[in-house]
Amino acid sequence: MAVPARHTSKAKKNKRRTHYKLTAPSVQFDETTGDFSRSHRVSLKGYYKGRKIAKANEAK
């Protein structure tokens, strides 16, 4: 039966857990549309790097 050979100390456990964290998504202001969008992605209005790339899904 698989059993840990040694007890895992609090310090060792907590050092491992320091990397378990959330990171906020990078958001940039788009001057063309005046909206915020995530970097390296097409905005909701269909713009990427100031140019119209795709059709926007407009709500009716």
From Swiss-Prot:
Q: Which GO terms describe its biological process?
A: translation
Q: Please list the coiled coil stretches.
A: none
Where in this protein does the record put region Disordered?
1-21
Q: Which InterPro entries match?
A: Ribosomal_bL32, Ribosomal_bL32_bact, Ribosomal_zn-bd
Named from the GO MF annotations, one term is: structural constituent of ribosome
Pull one GO CC term from this UniProt entry: large ribosomal subunit
Q: Where is the composition biased (Basic residues)?
A: 7-20
- Enumerate the UniProt keywords alphabetically: Ribonucleoprotein, Ribosomal protein
Q: State the family it belongs to.
A: Belongs to the bacterial ribosomal protein bL32 family.
NCBIfam families membership:
rpmF_bact
Q: What is the name attached to this protein's record?
A: Large ribosomal subunit protein bL32
What organism does this protein naturally occur in?
Answer: Streptococcus uberis (strain ATCC BAA-854 / 0140J)
